[in-house]
Regions:
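Aromatic-anchored, glycine/proline-accented short structural segments
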Residues: 175-234
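Nucleotide/phosphate-binding catalytic cleft detector across ATP-hydrolyzing
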Residues: 1-169, 188-202, 227, 236-241, ...
Length: 332
C-alpha cells in the first residue's frame, strides 16, 4: 500500500508555514508572509502575483504589501483568518501539485479558537468544494510537544537523539495574534492544562508601533505594515523617505516580552514551581533569542536563564511539522 501524502499548513496572522515530504521522502519546509489582498479585477502587470479563486482575484504574500491598504484583508481577528483560509489552501494545493496529490491536508487552530473548527471546515467545504474529511484539524501549541519530544531543540533528522528534553515543561507557542500555553507533566498534557489567549501575540508590538507612527508623523499604517517594520528592525521606507524606528521597535519588543513573562507568572506561577523548563516556540522565540541579553535581568526575576529553552533553528515550524507527524499517525 502506498504511503499517504500529506500537506501540513500552519496558517497564521503573520505567516503561512508549510511542511510536507517530497518524492524522495525528504522534509520540505516553506514560509510565506500571510498578507492577502483582494483586488477588483486582474491587471496585466499583476499576472505573476495574482491568484484567482472562483470569480475573485487575490494578491498573496509579499506582493500584497504593495497593494493599497483598503484592499488588504485585515488580519487581526478570527473573521479575517477565516476569510483568507480557503484562498491560501487553494493556492498551496495548486503550488504543490494539486488536490489529487495529497491524501489529506493537516491544519491547525489556536486554542483561543478551539470552538471554531466546524465553522472553518464549513467554510473550506463551501468555498473549495472539498469534503470536510479531506482536512485534519489539530491544536496549535499543544502539537509542538510531539516535535519537542522527538527532536528536542533541533528538527534536523541528524539531531533527533539529543538530551535537551525534559519531562515537565511549560510550552509557550507565541504567534502574531495569540499565545498558546501548554503545561506538560511527565511528558503528558491535558486539555485542562492548556490555554489560548487572543490578542496576546506579537501583534501587541505592532499595535504600539501603529500608535507611535500616527502620533509622531500623522501617518496611518496597517497592522501588517507595522509587522514588516518590526521584522526589518525598525527600517521603514514611505514615499521615498526613510525612517529609522529601531529604537522604538526595540523598546516596544522588550516591553512586550516582559509582559509575556509576567503573564506566565500570573497564570502559571504555581505550576512553574514544579517544572524543569519553559519551552518557547513560534515567532515569539525569535524575539526572545534576539533580545536575550537585554532581557536577562527580567527573566531572572522569575527563573534562571537556563530555565528557558528555545529551538536552535526553525522555531516557527514546530506546529506545521507537528501537524504533519500527527496526521501521518492518524491516517496510518
Amino acid at each position: 500500500m502506498a504511503k499517504p501524502n500529506i500537506l501540513a499548513v500552519d496558517l497564521g496572522y503573520s505567516s503561512v508555514k508549510c511542511a510536507y515530504y517530497n518524492e524522495s521522502d525528504v522534509l520540505q519546509l516553506e514560509k510565506f508572509i500571510s498578507c492577502t489582498a483582494k483586488v477588483d479585477s486582474p491587471l496585466e502587470s499583476d499576472d505573476d502575483s495574482l491568484f484567482q479563486l472562483g470569480t475573485s482575484y487575490y494578491v498573496l504574500g509579499t506582493p500584497a504589501l504593495k497593494v493599497p491598504r483598503s484592499q488588504q484583508i485585515k488580519l487581526n481577528s478570527w473573521e479575517g483568518l477565516l476569510e483568507i483560509y480557503p484562498v491560501w489552501i487553494s493556492f498551496l494545493l495548486k503550488r504543490y501539485g494539486g488536490k489529487e496529490k495529497f491524501t489529506k491536508v493537516a491544519i491547525g487552530l489556536s486554542l483561543a479558537f478551539k470552538d471554531k473548527a466546524d465553522e472553518l471546515l464549513d467554510k473550506l467545504e463551501k468555498t473549495l468544494m472539498i469534503p470536510k474529511d479531506y482536512f485534519i484539524i489539530l491544536p496549535q501549541g499543544l502539537i509542538a510537544k510531539k516535535i519537542y519530544y522527538e527532536y528536542g531543540l533541533n528538527i534536523n533528522e541528524a539531531s533527533k537523539k539529543n538530551n535537551t528534553k525534559v519531562q515537565n515543561v511549560l510550552i509557550v507557542d507565541g504567534g502574531f495574534l495569540t499565545l498558546d500555553i501548554c503545561n506538560v507533566i511527565n511528558g503528558t498534557a491535558s486539555s485542562s492544562a492548556t490555554i489560548g489567549i487572543e490578542n496576546s501575540g506579537v501583534i501587541c508590538i505592532s499595535y504600539k508601533l501603529v500608535e507611535y507612527i500616527f502620533k509622531q508623523y500623522g501617518i496611518s499604517i496597517s497592522i501588517k505594515e507595522a509587522q514588516v517594520i518590526v521584522d526589518n528592525d525598525g527600517a521603514w521606507k514611505r514615499r521615498g523617505r526613510i525612517y529609522d524606528l529601531s529604537t522604538q521597535v526595540k523598546q516596544f519588543t522588550l516591553e512586550y516580552l516582559v509582559d509575556v513573562l509576567n503573564l506566565l507568572e500570573n497564570k502559571f506561577g504555581e505550576a512553574l514551581d514544579g517544572l524543569d523548563a519553559v519551552l518557547i516556540v513560534g515567532g515569539i522565540a525569535y524575539f526572545f533569542k534576539k533580545y536575550m541579553s537585554e532581557l536577562t535581568p527580567e527573566i531572572e526575576k522569575h527563573f534562571p536563564l537556563s530555565f528557558i529553552q528555545i529551538p536552535e533553528i526553525e522555531s516557527e515550524f514546530y506546529n506545521a511539522f507537528g501537524f504533519l507527524k500527527a496526521a501521518y499517525e492518524l491516517v496510518g
